[in-house]
UniProtKB/Swiss-Prot annotation:
Catalytic activity: orotidine 5'-phosphate + diphosphate = orotate + 5-phospho-alpha-D-ribose 1-diphosphate
GO molecular function: magnesium ion binding; orotate phosphoribosyltransferase activity
Protein name in the entry: Orotate phosphoribosyltransferase
Organism: Shigella dysenteriae serotype 1 (strain Sd197)
Gene name per UniProt: pyrE
Domain of life: Bacteria
GO cellular component, as recorded: cytoplasm
Length: 213
């Protein structure tokens, strides 16, 4: 695990974005941990979040021309990632996002920001069922752009309805790489170094045995 990944886990724990316990997911599964990126909700949180996203992007080595943040959660993520890339990596790249509702005055259409063209890096918080990605792909393709990759904060590395994860489905269906700041594997590695969190480690490992990919 790289230093920025460890720092991201500690940041998420400090903001209670990442919690351990027993949680019922939308799928009905009982999970020993929960991740709610909506709790990154202050200026400082966003500034830090952008740095972690930018670090993961640069680390991935994937080449892209533009950041796209799907409405609504992807909008602040794309914005802060663009700022962090410019400030900390000297990469001044365009970004844009979509509106859920098209506008009939002012800037036309359902896109805000830079023109959606070239190789697009889609940034979002998590992929649960992959629905937001599929909707975004329609927008990207309609504008003649291509998907370079997808960046999210956490890859839960668990099966969807079938034998593979929603992330693996996205990679298969769109022939692109999905990268994440951290994965379930990183989370387990972090817990292994924290003896005081042994009960959480056991629960997370048991969950991975049952639902992991």
């Amino acid at each position: 695990m790289k230093p920025y990944q460890r720092q991201f886990i500690e940041f998420a724990l400090s903001k209670q974005v990442l919690k351990f316990g027993e949680f019922t997911l939308k799928s009905g599964r009982k999970s020993p941990y929960f991740f709610n990126a909506g709790l990154f909700n202050t200026g400082r949180d966003l500034a830090l979040l952008g740095r972690f996203y930018a670090e993961a992007l640069v680390d991935s080595g994937i080449e892209f021309d533009l950041l796209f943040g799907p409405a609504y959660k992807g909008i602040p993520i794309a914005t802060t990632t663009a700022v962090a890339l410019a400030e900390h990596h000297d990469l001044d790249l365009p970004y844009c996002f979509n509106r859920k509702e098209a506008k009939d005055h002012g800037e036309g259409g359902n896109l805000v920001g830079s023109a959606l063209q070239g190789r697009v890096m889609l940034v979002d918080d998590v992929i649960t069922a992959g629905t937001a990605i599929r909707e975004s792909m329609e927008i990207i393709q309609a504008n003649g752009a291509t998907l370079a990759g997808v960046l999210i904060s956490l890859d839960r590395q668990e099966r969807g309805r079938g034998e593979i994860s929603a992330i693996q489905e996205v990679e298969r269906d769109y022939n692109c790489k999905v990268i994440s700041i951290i994965t379930l594997k990183d989370l387990i590695a972090y817990l292994e170094g924290k003896p005081e969190m042994a009960e959480h480690l056991a629960a997370v490992k048991a969950y991975r045995e049952e639902f992991g990919v």
